[in-house]
């Protein structure tokens, strides 16, 4: 079991590494070549820049039981289909019970924006998001290790 991170725009990396190091779990952070990441714990993998390039590499490398951290519902749906776990950087767990609704809401929001309407932006990251990410990541690590 590993933690794979869609790290291009992923807040909370310090909490991910904290939870992983406490549980001796490998972390691989994926980003495109236009970003620079540094970590003394995680392996950093750079991929070519391009639309969905990081997502496609993660989908190709994920294995059953891995944990994927991403804000992207589409990526979450794909890795859930491969038997992996998925969580977003604010600590919300994606699962087979909520992913269809999230994808539908994303689709509807896109339609509203394309027709000139307005949708709500996500709220700013708060300390409680780091706490939720850490706690739910610990939960998923325990679940994946069973």
UniProtKB/Swiss-Prot annotation:
Name the InterPro entries for this protein. Answer: UPF0178 (IPR003791)
One family name in Pfam for this protein: DUF188
Q: Which family does it belong to?
A: Belongs to the UPF0178 family.
NCBIfam families membership: PRK00124.1
Protein name (database record): UPF0178 protein CTC_02403
Origin species: Clostridium tetani (strain Massachusetts / E88)
